[in-house]
Design a protein with these regions (language model features):
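N-terminal chloroplast transit peptides
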Residues: 1-45
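Short alpha-helical transmembrane segments in multi-pass integral membrane proteins
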Residues: 28, 39-76, 134-204, 238, ...
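Core transmembrane alpha-helical segments of multi-pass membrane transporters/permeases
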Residues: 71-84, 93, 129, 300-332, ...
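Helix-terminus/linker motif at the lipid-water interface of multi-pass membrane proteins
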Residues: 80, 84-107, 176-185, 242-249, ...
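Residue-level hotspots within pore-lining transmembrane alpha-helices
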Residues: 81, 85, 89, 119-123, ...
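Alpha-helical transmembrane segments of multipass membrane proteins
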Residues: 91, 210-214, 237-242, 270, ...
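Small-residue-rich hydrophobic transmembrane alpha-helices
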Residues: 106-166, 208-220, 224-225, 341-407, ...
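Short runs within selected transmembrane alpha-helices of multi-pass transporters and secretion channels
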Residues: 124-128, 197-217, 228-233, 254-270, ...
Length: 524
């Protein structure tokens, strides 16, 4: 209420004892009056006590932190469950093939799965840039950019998937030969029968990967991704025994069951994304097919190809470097002996099962950081990433402790040979250290992906892989043990973690560094 409006003639509820002759409007004073200099301008209203204000601000900060923690966990836990289902699915084909087709067919799955995992792990890297690009577009309220990104990504995946299917079918014997399956080996035919149908599922798998990345990135709906994974697992569980036992399809039947499940999940994912409000998010299937295979251009499809291809090339290089390091480690341990190799295989499976519990925090940090940076909130992105890292480190510590406490039970459940059990227990300390390193490294890499720094992540991983391979090759000359090789792998992880943390939080080029975040807040 202004001083003029406080007059009793205008406001009867006011006290009549006030000296209203002083209630003079500023506009009625002469121009040169000092009151025009701002003496009657309202100043800031200060609270009588700063205690409640401080408490209220602390309470608000705690509320914001709890809200962001819930957001991180809501993204992380469905992703963790979805990633944990994959190892179980990989055992499904193994179970039915071993039960119904015999040891030769079971042994043939080994090299076929090696080739399949190698190729698909590299191809699936397209999901990382798609997740960041769609998250940034939605945060910036540019749905047309989401449509453009998905058009480009789906065209790329369909083209690459078709090439992989055709070339893989022709070159399957050569690919299996790289896994030590010779032309005269009895493993060749069942391995080829399994590999070729799986490669024909490449277009469907890549489509599913891109749409899942869109659901988790643009819409932050990892629960929908989990439902898709469960759908694929259910279909695979039903179709695999039907194809192997009912139709006597052999290893090819098991592969076709997985491929059909993948295509069905891709169709459901397409429907989920297309029905999201605020679209259109997806191009029409006919136009997309014409663009991918007939060369007809869709509006917006020709723009921004360089960014997507560069990001995918960088992620491919990163995955190739990491997989090559593990391949070299496996080859060196193979020369050490059978028991260390069996222990290495069991520890790798166990380690990956524990590692998937931290994958969700990498995804959450990537999605939330990319959205906050797109909104111009680098300081919020910084403490979001730090809180995600704290959660990941807690999970990493818990999994490392669980591995140490349950090492004997895990070894006894996997193998019965006392030599293998003894070798397995010697690998527990380096595996625990690797879990702790991953707790920080994966979140740091998720931040870098959210910032779009794919090229630097690829360079860092390539450098670290070269260093780790060099250490392992030097150790191979002095009769190393399997724990020596695993500690050498920790060289790779440590380099990636240290340089990744510096790049994400301390580099001058990072918007999440403390100085850059403060400068951005002051500018705003």
């Amino acid at each position: 209420m202004s001083l003029w409006n406080a007059c009793p003639s205008r406001n009867p509820s006011c006290s009549s004892s006030f000296p209203w002759f002083l209630a003079v409007r500023v506009m009625d004073l002469p121009f040169r009056s000092p009151l025009h200099g701002g003496l009657l301008r309202p100043g800031p209203v200060l609270p009588r006590s700063r205690g409640p204000v401080v408490l209220r601000s602390k309470r608000d900060v705690e509320v914001r932190h709890r809200k962001r923690d819930r957001e991180i966990l809501s993204l992380a836990w469905p992703a963790v469950l979805g990633a944990s289902i994959d190892p179980v699915l990989s055992l499904l084909d193994t179970y039915w093939v071993s039960r119904c087709l015999g040891m030769v067919a079971l042994a043939a799955l080994g090299p076929a799965l090696n080739v399949e995992d190698w190729m698909f792990d590299i191809l699936k890297t397209v999901q990382v840039p798609v997740r960041s690009l769609t998250s940034e577009a939605v945060a910036a309220k540019k749905p047309q950019d989401v449509l453009q990104t998905l058009t480009q990504a789906l065209c790329f995946c369909w083209r690459v998937g078709l090439v992989v299917a055709l070339m893989g079918s022709v070159l399957a014997p050569l690919l299996l030969r790289l896994s030590s399956v010779e032309a005269s080996s009895p493993l060749l035919e069942p391995a080829k029968a399994y590999l070729v149908p799986r490669l024909w599922g490449s277009p469907g798998l890549l489509t599913l990967i891109v749409l899942q990345a869109t659901l988790s990135g643009a819409f932050r709906d990892t629960t929908a991704v989990l439902r898709l994974v469960l759908l694929g697992a259910f279909l695979n569980a039903v179709l695999t025994p039907l194809a192997v036992v009912g139709m006597h399809g052999g290893t090819a039947g098991a592969a076709w069951a997985t491929t059909v499940s993948c295509y069905a999940s891709a169709v459901c994912a397409w429907i989920m994304v297309a029905r999201r409000p605020g679209g259109p998010w997806l191009p029409q299937p006919r136009k997309l097919f014409a663009t991918a295979f007939l060369g007809k251009e869709v509006e917006g499809e020709s723009k921004g190809w360089g960014k997507l291809l560069a990001a995918n090339a960088a992620m491919t290089l990163r995955s190739f470097s990491s997989l090559t390091t593990w391949l070299v480690a496996c080859s060196i341990i193979t020369k050490i002996g059978v028991a260390p190799l069996a222990a290495h295989t069991c520890m790798t499976k166990t380690f990956l099962s524990f590692l998937y519990w931290m994958y969700g925090f990498q995804l959450a940090s990537q999605v939330l950081v990319s959205a906050d940076v797109a909104k111009g909130l680098p300081r919020r992105a910084r403490w979001t990433a730090l809180r995600a890292m704290r959660m990941a480190m807690l999970v990493a510590s818990a999994t490392a402790l669980a591995l140490w406490v349950g090492r004997e039970s895990i070894a006894a459940a996997l193998v019965r040979d006392p030599l293998v059990i003894q070798s397995f227990e010697t690998l527990v300390p380096p595996a625990m250290a690797m879990l702790l390193i991953y707790g920080a490294m994966w979140v740091a890499e998720g931040v870098l992906y959210g910032l779009g720094d794919y090229a630097w992540a690829a360079k860092c991983t390539s450098f670290a892989a070269s260093a780790a391979i060099l250490v392992m090759l030097l150790l191979s000359r002095v009769q190393p043990t399997a724990p020596h090789i695993w500690w050498s792998l920790n060289v790779l992880m440590s380099i990636r973690a240290i340089f990744g943390l510096h790049r994400a939080f301390f580099s001058k080029r990072s918007p999440l560094s403390s100085k850059a975040a403060m400068a951005s807040e002051i500018t705003q």
